[in-house]
Every structure is written in structure tokens, then in C-alpha cells.
């Protein structure tokens, strides 16, 4: 009788813990996904889009070549982060991650292509503008699905 009771308690605990673990995994997946895309967006915005808007890639700009190479390295980092996010969305059951993840492979290819040009010191204005359009498409798609993604500047003490 005691063995049956222990088996019943164990089975009940597993039935309750199973869905709870899945819910935690989904929250953890979303947090990791947001981290990777956030890191990619930060690299793009800080080292590519902002200098582009400030004309730091134009001929004759001070440190033009260095800025272009930095942008290329930043896009390589962003492509790695997006690739990690794509891998996460392949096996997830979360509908939001699956939908947003379906938009990422094309974005990753664009990041890599423009990044390779910039790392070689070749300025690709159309590519940078295209990347910005793709970023806005991703942000709008997330908002349409009820998960708005807003860039937030987080102050780091001492910097």
C-alpha cells in the first residue's frame, strides 16, 4: 500500500511539474532570444546606423576607414547573435518565437553580406539602408503580434 501511495505521489508531482517546467523553459527561451536580438540591435545601432547618420562613412570624414572596419566587425557580431537566435527558434513551441524566427534567416544573410563588405573597407550605403528597413520590419512584426520590442538605453554606472 505504501509503495502504491509513493508511486501515486510521484506521478502526481511529475504531472504538475511537467507543464511548469515547459512554462519556465518558454520564459527562459524568450529571455535568451531577446538578449541575442538585443545585442545584435545594439551592435547595429551603435556601430553602424548611428555613424552612418552622422556621415562618418563618407569620403573625407575623419577616421573613415576605421569607422567602416568597426562597422563591419559589429555586423559580424550582430550576424552571430542573430544566427544564435535563429537556432533557438528552430525547436521552440512558442508561436511568437517561431513567427519572428521565420524572418531572421534573410536578415542574417544581409548582415553577413554587408558586414563582409565593410570589413574589407568597402562602404555599402544601399546595404546599410536595407538593413535598417529589415530592422524596422522585425520591430513592426513583433508589435503586430502583441510583443512590442522597444530599444531602451540602459545607463551603465561609471561610463
Write out the residue ranges for each language-model feature.
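Bacterial N-terminal signal peptides that target proteins for export
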Residues: 1-9
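Bacterial N-terminal signal peptides
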Residues: 9-18
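Non-transmembrane, amphipathic alpha-helical segments
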Residues: 26-36, 56-70, 89-99, 120-130
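Alpha-helical segments in soluble extracytoplasmic regions
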Residues: 40-92, 103
Amino acid at each position: 500500500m505504501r509503495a502504491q501511495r509513493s508511486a501515486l505521489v510521484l506521478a502526481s508531482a511529475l504531472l504538475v511539474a511537467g507543464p511548469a517546467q515547459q512554462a519556465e523553459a518558454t520564459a527562459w527561451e524568450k529571455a535568451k532570444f531577446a538578449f541575442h536580438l538585443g545585442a545584435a540591435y545594439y551592435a547595429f545601432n551603435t556601430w553602424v546606423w548611428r555613424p552612418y547618420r552622422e556621415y562618418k562613412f563618407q569620403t573625407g570624414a575623419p577616421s573613415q576607414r576605421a569607422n567602416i572596419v568597426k562597422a563591419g566587425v559589429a555586423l559580424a557580431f550582430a550576424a552571430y547573435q542573430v544566427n544564435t537566435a535563429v537556432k533557438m527558434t528552430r525547436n521552440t513551441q512558442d508561436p511568437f518565437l517561431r513567427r519572428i524566427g521565420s524572418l531572421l534567416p534573410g536578415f542574417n544573410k544581409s548582415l553577413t553580406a554587408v558586414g563582409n563588405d565593410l570589413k574589407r573597407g568597402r562602404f555599402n550605403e544601399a546595404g546599410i539602408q536595407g538593413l535598417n528597413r529589415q530592422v524596422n520590419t522585425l520591430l513592426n512584426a513583433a508589435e503586430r503580434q502583441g510583443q512590442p520590442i522597444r530599444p531602451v538605453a540602459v545607463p551603465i554606472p561609471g561610463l
